[in-house]
Swiss-Prot record:
It comes from Caenorhabditis elegans. Residues 416-451 have a biased composition (Acidic residues). This is Cytosolic carboxypeptidase 1. Catalyzes the deglutamylation of polyglutamate side chains generated by post-translational polyglutamylation of proteins such as tubulins. Via the deglutamylation of tubulin, regulates the localization and velocity of kinesin motors and the structural integrity of microtubules in sensory cilia. In male CEM sensory neurons, regulates the cilia release of bioactive extracellular vesicles. Also regulates microtubule dynamics in uterine muscle cells. Its EC number is 3.4.17.-.
Length: 1015
């Protein structure tokens, strides 16, 4: 048997000779060394230089000095009649290459390996290997080392390949894996993690669950593992429970499990492992003193508890299982466990998730309530114009407006849900999968065009159509030496009232908002709210109450009936300071003002109010998130509970310390501030019965509703307060702000305001051109930066970032701002979707669709906002011959902290041809990293580089970021995303974001453009 020193000696041969030997082996040269002779080289100690040489030779593209090289040659060597030692060596070689990637340069090679479809090759080999293993009667003849290496490689590379689930299914590996699981008691170490990974795909999970004998065998293994109290066995039980969760989502499998009394058994598992994971403090202390307390075992029991509750929550979605759980006294079990928890031991980490999960399970098993608005049609709509014909030269065809909108409003944003609430129970803190997957894990439902790389059809304007945008680029011919003061003074003569009255609405308006609501700074820095035990408290309170009856509730506010009642005419009033109290009434509500959103309020207890949000006008898909309402007639020092009950997202930052904002008319000098105690976010009891019936017929997902619940104790009796999802920013305030900023601007700043189009309601879509006065020749030498914001009305943080950009560019005296204006021409569209903003929508324009899914084929009649903005960029690229230095579209993100960007990296595209199209030279330049690198250099305390993503999915082809990159070749096209909540890094860590922070992000972005010029 060779010693360790012999192995090292084998590796110490001239490294270049080893590379040549491997190359000869790949080319099957007659004199080449065998795989058995080369295998010891995989076990040595390598220097960084040697690792780099190995990666260059066999982990990337072909090298001209070698007979066979590059990862494609390694993959090709797998094909044909290879011996077991050959396959082991090739797998070890791939694993070594993939394991040694560390630097950013290596990450590019890692992505290249994934693009070369290693998973497809490994899938074929593994499939053959499983079939051979199952046919062998003599276990001793099986080389288990090969199996371990294969599964290790599949798991490692599978975590990096977003299409691994599809490739495994298409490669026919699922059935052999199911058969192996059924027949073998002992499996390779990474078999189960990989099996769980691919079962996350709904289609794969259903196929596995339906495989004959699989569920029966899975339950047998679970029960056998449950009998052991060894840490390794409990951890293995956790993995099997994960597999059970992902494979029981189809009706046939659930029915089979219910026949086998799965609910009763899982409750027994829950009780047993809860007891093991939550030993009382005295017991733990004694165990620790005598050295008998096993922390790792307790942690393993905790994971089993979390997984078991997730399965019970999934089962409770279905009436038969829910009824069975109620008969088994699940509510009593959960209530008892919640009350027995040590309150100071369950504030963070996995065990706090047990509290939240038990609370959610309680809610699932309570009697559902009918959704009060299920049969009501929203009374406010807007008649849409007829769609214009497709742009000449484009590939579209004329369709009616509704079909155009429906075809486009079908893609989720990065901010929308991608997984079920229960699925998140299995994304663990130490799970690489949760961190490394940049795109969707599943390609289910994709057609052949997507798999084969066919691009969606796009349109562009012809020269005649582009000509009408020439007036917005007069600086190219005339320079910017002419002052624009005449227009500015005319605009500034307008009062706040006249600006408000010029804004066009579809939603009814009862009063105007005071200008002080927007121009009072919010400099107070408030910490994120404590969330520990909020859900527990709420659930225990609910369990102690008598069962609710919908008939006992009182409707306090109903926009459907009050929409146009009592509206002042012709001149709308401004709200006054309050101070009055009508003792005959409880709280009063209203949302009939610009950007307001509240449809109905139901009083369910003396101080508990349920609030229902209005839909986006004409919406084709439901969007409920943005709220902004007035509340009055309150009593001082009374704790009121507000519950927004028709949210749709399964998770929210409201469960992580975020609070709503409130503006008090009696304390207006304080501006907006964060309010709300005991804030929690959870799935409530409302079910849309019409949706449920429709889903039975159409096999679609049921619609559930989620609540934001919080308590507010008002400081003044009879006050008038406004409560909102985030700091409001209206279209009227934008117009007033532009007027004031141009009046205050520096003398050496050129600022021109153009109206590039009108929204469906007739609101002007404005664009600002900002630079310094210069001749036409000097203007020709300047690069152009295009910025846009507020395509999604509910993302008010985007407007506050834009406010910071405008204040700095127009009014700030600093060397940096002077250099920016001297170096660049800024084309800024501060609010793309004024109609959505004005009418209190969350995501849509009056066309009822997400405008950020219309960039590939905007229709001039239906989507004039995007049509005009895209035309500006096309004019720059094709007429002015000035491809933008950068394009940044500013957004808000409701699930993430800090701020970050999304860009476009061709090597991470859903379309394999993109890598070939852009060419190796451009990939090497890494232009897509220019802005994030600059932001990290200029503002590391707020910018979170780890949240940046550069993948390109098919669903995002119609977004601004991807379309500007693809159609116009702007490599530096980005989406900037900012949190609604707060910061997780730097000196701001633990604090909620305010408008001053958001303005500073705008300044950060401007500084980063200067940083980009250095590279």
């Amino acid at each position: 048997m060779p010693s360790d020193s012999d192995d090292v000696a084998a590796v110490k041969q001239p490294w270049s000779q080893l590379i040549v030997d491997i190359s000869n082996f790949l080319s099957e040269h007659p004199q080449s060394k065998t795989s058995q002779a080369l295998l010891p080289s995989c076990n040595g100690v390598w220097s960084d230089e040697e690792k780099l040489e190995l990666i260059e030779a066999f982990g990337h593209k072909k090298q001209s000095h070698l007979t066979k090289s590059g990862v494609k040659a390694v993959l090709a060597a797998f094909e044909g009649d290879r011996t077991q030692p050959d396959v082991i060596f090739l797998c070890r070689l791939l694993h070594l290459i993939f394991s040694h990637f560390s630097s950013e340069n290596d990450r590019k090679k890692e992505k290249y390996i994934v693009k070369c479809d290693v998973i497809a090759t490994l899938t074929r080999i593994t499939r053959k290997r499983i079939i051979m293993t199952l046919d062998v009667t003599d276990e001793s003849s099986i080389d288990h080392n090969l199996d371990e290496v294969l599964w290790k490689l599949l798991h490692k590379i599978g975590l990096k390949d977003p299409r691994v689930s599809l490739k495994v299914r298409m490669g026919g590996l699922i059935s052999p894996m199911c058969k192996l699981f059924i027949q073998k008691d002992t499996l390779p170490e990474l078999f189960l993690p990989f099996f769980i990974k691919i079962s996350r795909s709904p289609r794969n999970g259903q196929a596995i669950g339906r495989y004959e004998g699989f569920m029966t065998r899975l339950l047998v293994k679970i029960k056998a593992l449950d009998a052991s109290d060894q840490t390794s066995q409990v951890l293995l039980l956790d993995k099997h429970l994960q597999l059970l969760f992902f494979t029981m989502k189809n009706k046939r499998t659930r029915t089979q499990l219910l026949r086998e009394n799965i609910c009763k058994y899982l409750l027994e598992v829950l009780r047993r492992h809860l007891a093991s994971s939550s030993n009382s403090r005295p017991t733990r202390l004694l165990s620790s003193l005598f050295g008998t307390f096993d922390k790792s075992l307790s942690a393993a029991h905790t994971e089993v508890v979390i997984g078991t509750i997730a399965i019970l929550r999934l089962l409770s979605n279905f009436k038969k299982a829910r009824d069975e759980l109620k008969n088994l006294q699940v509510l009593d079990i959960c209530s008892r466990e919640l009350k027995e928890f040590w309150s100071d031991e369950w504030k963070t980490g996995p065990k706090s998730r047990i509290v939240d999960s038990l609370s959610a399970l309680c809610l699932r098993c309570m009697s559902p309530l009918p959704y009060p608005l299920e049969t009501r049609r929203f009374p406010i709509d807007f008649p849409l114009p007829t769609a214009t014909p497709s742009t000449p030269g484009g590939h579209g065809r004329i369709r009616n407006s509704s079909s155009i909108n429906i075809s486009f409003d079908n893609g989720r944003s990065s901010d929308e849900d991608g997984m079920d609430e229960e699925d998140e129970a299995f994304v663990r803190d130490d799970d690489d999968e949760g961190k490394d997957d940049r795109g969707s894990d599943d390609d289910d439902g994709k057609d052949d065009d997507e798999i084969n790389g066919a691009l969606p059809k796009t349109t562009r304007l012809n020269p005649q159509q582009l000509a009408k945008y020439a007036p917005f680029f007069v600086e190219n011919e005339q320079g910017t030496l002419q002052p624009t003061f005449s227009m500015i003074y005319q605009t500034n003569q307008e009062s706040w009232r006249s600006i408000c009255e010029k804004t066009r609405h579809v939603m009814p308006i009862h009063h105007h908002l005071p200008i002080e609501m927007f121009n009072t700074p919010t400099r107070i820095r408030e910490k994120t709210a404590k969330t520990s035990n909020n859900m527990k408290k709420m659930i225990i309170e609910e369990l102690d109450k008598p069962e609710r009856s919908a008939t006992s509730n009182q409707v306090i506010y109903d926009l459907d009936t009050a929409a146009f009642d009592g509206l002042p005419s012709p001149e709308l009033p401004f709200v006054t300071g309050g101070g009055k109290l009508d003792t005959s009434k409880d709280l009063q509500f209203d949302s009939r003002f610009e950007s307001g959103n509240l449809r109905m309020v139901i009083q369910v207890a003396p101080t508990h109010y349920e609030l229902f949000l209005s839909p986006d006008v004409n919406q084709l898909r439901d969007h409920y998130q943005w709220f902004f309402f007035q509340v009055s007639n309150m009593r001082k020092s009374v704790k009121y509970t507000f519950e927004i009950v028709n949210c749709l997202k399964s998770t929210s930052l409201y469960s992580q310390g975020m609070q709503p904002v409130m503006y008090s008319m009696m304390e207006s000098a304080n501006g907006w501030r964060r309010v709300g105690e005991n804030v929690c976010y959870f799935r409530n009891l409302y079910i849309n019965e019409n949706e449920e019936k429709k889903n039975v017929e159409e096999q679609k997902k049921k619609k559930y509703y989620y609540s934001i619940r919080f308590n507010v104790t008002f400081q003044n009796t009879g006050d008038i307060c406004y409560i909102a999802y985030h700091y409001p920013y209206t279209y009227s305030f934008l117009n007033s702000s532009l007027s004031m900023l141009k009046k205050r601007k520096q003398e050496n700043v050129y600022c021109r305001e153009d109206v590039i189009g009108h929204s469906l309601a007739g609101n002007p879509i404005k664009m600002l051109t900002i630079t310094t006065p210069a001749s036409a020749a000097e203007i020709a030498a300047r690069e152009v930066i295009v910025l846009s914001a507020r395509v999604h009305p509910g993302e008010t943080n985007a407007s506050w970032i834009m406010q910071g950009i405008l204040e700095n560019l127009l009014c700030r005296q600093s060397n940096e701002m002077y250099r920016l204006r001297e170096s660049f021409i800024f084309k800024i569209v501060p609010m793309i979707n004024p109609d959505g903003v004005t009418n209190g929508s969350h995501r849509c324009s009056l066309a009822g669709i997400d405008l950020n899914r219309m960039w590939d084929r905007p229709n001039e009649a239906l989507h004039p906002e995007v049509f005009a903005t895209k035309a500006i960029i096309q004019y720059l690229c094709e007429v002015a011959n000035k491809k933008p230095f950068a394009y940044v579209d500013i957004h808000g993100h409701s699930k993430k902290w800090d701020y970050f960007v999304y860009g476009n990296n061709a090597s991470e595209s859903w379309r394999a041809d993109d890598v070939l199209d852009v060419g190796a030279a451009q990939l090497e330049e890494e232009l897509h990293l220019a802005l994030p690198k600059a932001l990290e250099a200029t503002c590391p305390s707020r910018f979170n580089a780890s949240e940046c993503r550069f993948n390109i999915t098919r669903a995002k082809e119609s977004s601004a970021r991807v379309n500007v990159w693809r159609q116009f070749g702007v490599s530096t096209a980005y989406t900037l995303e900012s949190t609604f909540c707060g910061f997780h890094k730097g000196q701001n860590s633990g604090y909620q974001i305010n408008t001053s922070d958001l303005k500073e992000i705008g300044r950060d972005l401007l500084h980063s453009f200067l940083e980009m010029t250095k590279t």
